[in-house]
Amino acid sequence: MRILVSNDDGIYSSGLWALVKRLKEVGEVVVVAPDREQSATGTQVTLRQPLRVQKTHPLIPGIEAYSVEGSPCDCVIMGLAKLITEPVDLVVSGINHGLNLGDDVLISGTVGAALQGYLRNIPSIAISIPVTAEEPENLDSAACITAEIARRIQSGHISKNSFLNINTPDLPLCRINELRVTPLAHKTHIETVEEGHDGRKRYFWLRRRQLSPADNNETDIWAVENGLISISALHERLFQQPPFMLEDTETAGILASARALQDII
């Protein structure tokens, strides 16, 4: 299995390399990631200037890694079209430092990168974890879950037409009771505009304020707030539950296998 890994936090993000550490146990991993942070870039594609690519020193020996002076979408497009010469079997984006829940997926660079794989008929995963301190403490939990999902895509237990958005609590897997398939919550934030003046001219800051919508019960937000792992299947009708299901035995099996993987260390 050949896996393209990208993100929107930049090529030296700890989340990306925690993910690579686990995915290299599943298949051959190639990293193509932005040369700097590109959060909230959504589906941005660079069309009006050239893209510059540099082969970089990997943080894990033996991994082929490239940095791209562009968006997360640019990275996946470049990886699939130019940098990886053999067919790619899976695109994984993350581990994002910060959750991507509800309608946040529409502006997420993490999800945008995974979308580029899905649009090219490659199964794709976006994986995120909350940031409650300067650095998430349990990146390996998210990495182990992603590795188990990748194994099930490889074996055919999960559809190879999947585009999955996964959000995990920042907890060790032994403290997470369930992985749940969820729909996306609806409106989660509202944007406001703050005005200031620098002595010469006006300037503006866009701010996002989190809402607490009433319809969050059983959604991706509800799951993570209750200490569960949320897995949502994305497609062209993002806010309708698509025909993606996992049996309870399958979700329990993924969690158990990921826990066992984490216990090996």
From Swiss-Prot:
SUPFAM superfamilies: SurE-like
InterPro entries: SurE, SurE-like_Pase/nucleotidase, SurE-like_sf
KW Cytoplasm (keyword) present: yes
Keywords noted in UniProt: Cytoplasm, Hydrolase, Metal-binding, Nucleotide-binding
Location(s) in or outside the cell: Cytoplasm
Cofactor binding, note field: Binds 1 divalent metal cation per subunit.
Named cofactor requirement(s): a divalent metal cation
GO MF term (any one): 5'-nucleotidase activity
Transmembrane segments: none
Enzyme Commission identifier(s): 3.1.3.5
Ligand binding (a divalent metal cation): 8-9, 39, 96
Reaction(s) catalysed (UniProt annotation): a ribonucleoside 5'-phosphate + H2O = a ribonucleoside + phosphate
Gene Ontology CC terms: cytoplasm
Family under the similarity heading: Belongs to the SurE nucleotidase family.
Function of the protein: Nucleotidase that shows phosphatase activity on nucleoside 5'-monophosphates.
Cited HAMAP family: SurE
Protein name: 5'-nucleotidase SurE
Designated gene of the protein: surE
